[in-house]
């Protein structure tokens, strides 16, 4: 028999110690990984609930197991809230991750070996947009587009040329490291010109879209996927959205279950429903606007200090720092900043001479620092400290000095109050 007051501490001290150390790391480090954020206590509470015990293969009202009457209510609420939040007619809240949501779209719309056109990983795309190390580049014939060398923005003329030349069955719009506004309609027009599906992955900007601060692709694309964490600030998971199309909805549902997954994670779906309600509530638009403002302040400060920001700035929550002209690798920059309690991730940049394991850039994002209360003043100061480290990357005294400042800033702005 289990009791609600059972504790990990005292039973599994090894796990508990690692958990406590991670709590301390999150409190004492500034988090600038663009795909990370801090969920609300409500979201975490749902994920630690007894819902984790329930198997519920199928969909609300059409389950393969009994005893699903209450989890049906939860999943339907998550579906309805997702549709309201993004103006969709269809929503599937079951994907365990963004990559699994993307895999379901591929499975629903394509046959193995068919051609897809997606953004190059080195130019800001995602593994699942056609990278050769991903299912998307192994099972399907992937063609890649990139950024204009002069503007650092998506080269729509190249997209149109590649689409005409290769006749893909599906075009993927979306990114994991692109800082400008994507012209969804331009992609729609290109897809229509060759009779291709338009699939948008808005995982990184879903929170901004929900707040009305970034163009919504749902009315334009055939299908849209997103994660539920990142800017959306919910649990780690995936979501598929679409306009009214009964045949497409059936294909997508079947591609998620039974083709791609078995039982849904009902505790995570409950957390998604809570996250969607939070996004529909007061203060959410202001939060997302601050995310953008902080990113712009950081990008501007980097440029003032002589650093190259890919695409020349940002319109969302992230940007890429190109370190090629500084003679610094992303790997070394990541490690040095880590010693200063600043967490970033190394990232490939356009025309990167380094391997993906080394890189010549950093990806920087502001959702997490905004969640813990950082404003423009803190964002500018933090950027200056990062520049101090990168300007003298081997100077451990500089790193120690910056770490002290970071610890002080973190103490004043706790992750959870």
Swiss-Prot record:
Q: Which InterPro entries match?
A: PyrdxlP-dep_Trfase (IPR015424), PyrdxlP-dep_Trfase_major (IPR015421), PyrdxlP-dep_Trfase_small (IPR015422), Ser_HO-MeTrfase (IPR001085), Ser_HO-MeTrfase-like (IPR049943), Ser_HO-MeTrfase_PLP_BS (IPR019798), SHMT-like_dom (IPR039429)
Q: What residues does (6S)-5,6,7,8-tetrahydrofolate bind to?
A: 121, 125-127, 355-357
Cellular component annotations (GO), alphabetically ordered: cytosol
Record's subcellular location: Cytoplasm
One biological process term in Gene Ontology:
tetrahydrofolate interconversion
Residue numbers of N6-(pyridoxal phosphate)lysine PTMs: 230
Listed name of the protein: Serine hydroxymethyltransferase 4
Q: Which organism is it from?
A: Colwellia psychrerythraea (strain 34H / ATCC BAA-681)
Gene it is expressed from: glyA4
């Amino acid at each position: 028999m289990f009791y609600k007051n059972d504790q990990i501490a005292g039973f599994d001290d090894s796990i508990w110690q690692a958990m406590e150390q991670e709590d301390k790391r999150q409190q004492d480090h500034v988090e600038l990984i663009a795909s990370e954020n801090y969920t609300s206590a409500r979201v975490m509470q749902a994920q630690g609930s007894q819902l984790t015990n329930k198997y519920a293969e199928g969909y609300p009202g059409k389950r393969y197991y009994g005893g699903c009457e209450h989890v049906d209510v939860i999943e339907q609420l998550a579906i309805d809230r997702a549709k309201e939040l993004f103006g969709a007619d269809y929503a599937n809240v079951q994907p365990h991750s963004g990559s699994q949501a993307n895999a379901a779209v591929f499975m629903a719309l394509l046959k193995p070996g068919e051609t897809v056109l997606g953004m190059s990983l080195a130019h800001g795309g995602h593994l699942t947009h056609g990278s050769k190390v991903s299912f998307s580049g192994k099972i399907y014939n992937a063609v890649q587009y990139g950024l204009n060398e002069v503007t650092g923005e998506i080269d729509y003329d190249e997209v149109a040329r590649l689409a005409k030349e290769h006749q893909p069955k599906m075009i993927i719009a979306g990114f994991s490291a692109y800082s400008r506004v994507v012209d969804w309609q331009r992609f729609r027009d290109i897809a229509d010109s060759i009779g291709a599906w338009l699939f948008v992955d808005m995982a990184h900007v879903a929170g901004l879209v929900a707040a009305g601060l970034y163009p919504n692709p749902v009315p334009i694309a055939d299908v849209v996927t997103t994660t539920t964490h990142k800017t959306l600030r919910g649990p780690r998971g995936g979501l598929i959205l679409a306009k009214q199309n009964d045949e497409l909805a059936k294909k997508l549902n079947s591609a998620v279950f039974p083709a791609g997954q078995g039982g849904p994670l009902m505790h995570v779906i409950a957390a998604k429903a809570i996250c969607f309600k939070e996004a529909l509530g007061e203060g959410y638009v202001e939060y997302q606007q601050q995310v953008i403002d902080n990113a712009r302040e950081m990008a501007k400060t980097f440029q003032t200090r002589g650093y190259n920001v890919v695409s020349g700035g940002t319109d969302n929550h992230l940007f890429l720092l190109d370190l090629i002209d500084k003679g610094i690798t992303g790997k070394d920059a990541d490690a040095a900043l880590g010693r200063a309690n600043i967490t970033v991730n190394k990232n490939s940049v356009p025309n990167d001479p380094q391997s993906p394991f080394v890189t010549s850039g950093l990806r920087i994002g502001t959702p997490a620092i905004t969640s813990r209360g950082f404003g423009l003043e803190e964002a500018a100061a933090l950027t200056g400290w990062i520049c101090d480290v990168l300007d003298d990357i081997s100077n451990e005294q500089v790193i120690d000095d910056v770490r002290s400042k970071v610890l002080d800033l973190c103490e004043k702005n706790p992750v959870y109050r």
